[in-house]
Amino acid sequence: MKKCIYLIVILFSFFSEKAISQEIEQNVEERLQTFFKKHTVSTVNTGTCRLDSFRIDFQKKKIYIYASEQLSYQPHRPESVDNLYHNIRLLLPGPVNYFNIAVFTGGKTIEELIPNIYRKGKKDKERLFTDLNYKGTPWVTRISRPYEISRGLEGRHIAVWQSHGKYYINNKNKWGWQRPRLFCTTEDLFTQSFIIPYLIPMLENAGANVFTPRERDTQKQEVIVDNDGNLDRDSGQGSFYLEVKSRKSQWASTGKPGFAQRKHIYEDGDTPFLDGTARFTNTEKKKDKAFAEWVPDIPKTGEYAVYVSYQNMPNSVSDAKYLVFHNGGVTEFKVNQRIGGGTWVYLGTFTFDKGRNDYGMVVLSNESKEKGVVCADAVRFGGGMGNIARGGQTSGLPRYLEGARYSAQWAGMPYSVYAGYKGKDDISDDINTRSRMVNYLAGGSIFNPTEQGLGVPFEMSMALHSDAGVKTDDRIVGTLGIYTTDFNNGQLTTGKDRYASRDLSDILMTQLEHDIRSTYNIDWTRRSMWNRNYSETRLPSVASTIVELLSHQNFADMQLGHDPNFKFTVGRALYKAILQYISTQHGKDYIVQPLPVSHFAIHFGKKKNTLELSWKGENDPLE
């Protein structure tokens, strides 16, 4: 009899507890559903959030809450995370309001979505690069810079690019833009107006080596001076290449294929960097010994980008000395010829006079602190016209207006880099080429150790796009960020967590939102951060993101987008964000470059035959 009573009591207690638990869970579910439906962030437009599921562990006194991915679209900070947990706790019924709470979204707790730079406590080392610090010589160093950079982007290698470009439409057998013409432009042209004149110079002035897979020089003319001679063409007919030997150092052929321009127009698969030869000589410590000289016959006075090329040899030196003679004087560079061989290597953009001049040339000296060899191949002046034929015709446009696929071929990239679809789908190839060029250049470096390539240590990439979308009430569409974590088991090729890309995306969007709102006193819209499968965020071996800056289809966005002041603000915000991200990744302090001076003037000096320069410094209200 007693056993029956005990059993009845136990069963009654069990079912009572279960009933109470079910009642609590039903109550919690209703409250959480209401909470997440109403959850918004005043400055961020990420769409409606919802409760996916939850689980209460009464024994461990824990509540696991799983919200929809919209919660991961918003930025998370220590304060906002604490506030979210506090508000959830306030709405929960007793006794579970005293339980430990964990909120998940997109497979992570919201605490894990706080970028390292904004964390007050423990950092996520799996996203940091503190143990991945390139200790070699940078690809290109501007020796003539009148100051040294110590807390900027010195020694860092960064890939950034503008979106799209003219491409060959395979099924229509014609060339066309990838995006429609709207508000006096197309995205293929529009995003260049931020990247080329603003962002890239800002990054380079901070000390970075910057690569962009599309042609960066807007100069329509192009002159190539090569040891294999010059192709007869309208421009550059009087150009010449010269070698001077020393007693100890003779110039000789490397015995490996190098660059040569054998034709005016190139077909799919042609590789100009396999059509010629290259030269080399031993290095010496003394100045003015052996050297090679490239003298262009410039067709028209103007600014020309200068690109050099060489081959990587077993005993190449990391301090090959190049001198660029131009209208502004002589600029000296040091190029690390142990990496980045067999392609065009950008030195800088300079003004050259028409014709052939003693003050217009490039010189490679064999002077070096290292024992080894320097290599000489072609030098290119100017961006030039597109010379890749598709369907029997070229684009007819300057190269800088074309997509990356065609620049990649002219730059000597392997066919697999720019033609994964074997010439049958140029638009897909163009999208993939941007990332694959970075991977190939970085292959074998500490940031891409698993792929073969040219060893240049690129550590991040950013693609700038504009988006579609219309607001009928002239509100701003604003900025969207994109990154990808669901690839390669969630890791970069270094083994680091791909959520480093989310950190990069968040920092960029945060800086853009802050600077645009503060400068123009407008409610600039910060949209979502999408964790989705896009080529430009999936394929790069390094941390990568897409910034969809604004809508090229919306009047309110484009009213600002065409303003040069706005372009400067955006460029500077992107530069500052990249500076913050990379410095944090390596645990380094940083200083933001000051604004350009104003009120610059030249006056006659008090003394005879003298001039005085004057200017005013500019305070930066955003720093």
Give the residues covered by each predicted segment.
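A short beta-strand element within beta-rich, extracytoplasmic domains
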Residues: A278-F280, A290-P314
